[in-house]
Amino acid sequence: MKWSDPKYLIVFLITLVLVAGEARYDILGGYDRLATTLGICIATEVVLSWWLRGRVANIASAYITGISLALLTKPQANILWPFALGAFIAIASKYVLIYRGRHLWNPSNFAIALLVLVASDSVAILSHQWGNDLRINLIIWAFGLAVAWRARVLHVTLTYVACFVLLAAVRNAIVGGPLLAELAPITGPMYQLFVFFMVTDPRTTVSTRRGRMLVVAIVALAETIIRLGGDFQVALLRPFYPSPPILALAIVGPIAMWWDLYRQGRKAT
């Protein structure tokens, strides 16, 4: 096991987000939530990998998924079932929702999107910002960008961030208000998890560099459309209002992944 492997650097990064968020803002809301998501994610990964593939998978992926779910899922007080169900759905999706041997959704993205869509009255998404704590932002973004570079997905992160900033300016020009209010969300832990762990997930991104950049640009555009839908009260988009980036990726990502795998299969034949 090489600790310089991007997989373990990503484990360290998400642990850093967890520790910083919990120490500064108590964003977990209870360690029972963390124990539930981590325990079920790891147990499900171990059981399904052994049962379906004949070997126990590396649990680093389950750990990352568990931390993401524990941080991002914010249900009504004192209920644990969204964490338990979300953890099981996230890991199970890797073994069920597959095409040509690859899963189509990032596990935590799929689970959170599903929970928000079907149980929006009970489940919300983390909305904390890091406020004016520049040190936390600098540390997490600096390490996150370094990990993205080491994992060779820096172009994905930077493309999404650039598109987010550009489209935030466009939305601001349309609806008005302070531009900083449009840009502020990307400094928070939800977007840090999104740009460093979801849109860059190697197992659910397309095969070419240009394709990956195009996909995240479309995700950012879809997110902006959802946000504008909220501004103008478009009823058709109402189910997507709780978390535009999560739901935009849940729609665009698997379609792009399926098409990429389909094209590769046709070329092979």
Located regions from the model:
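N-terminal signal-anchor module of multipass membrane proteins
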Residues: 1-50
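Short, non-helical or kinked segments that cap or interrupt transmembrane helices
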Residues: 55-62, 80, 100-110, 154, ...
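C-terminal ends of transmembrane helices
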Residues: 43-54, 89-103, 142-152, 196-206, ...
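Internal active-site segments that recognize and position negatively charged phosphoryl groups
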Residues: 119-170, 176-177
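Structural signature of hydrophobic alpha-helical transmembrane segments
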Residues: 25-40, 72-86, 122-138, 179-192
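Alpha-helical transmembrane segments in multi-pass membrane proteins
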Residues: 13-15, 33-45, 61-70, 82-90, ...
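Membrane-interface helix-loop-helix junctions at boundaries between adjacent transmembrane segments
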Residues: 55-131
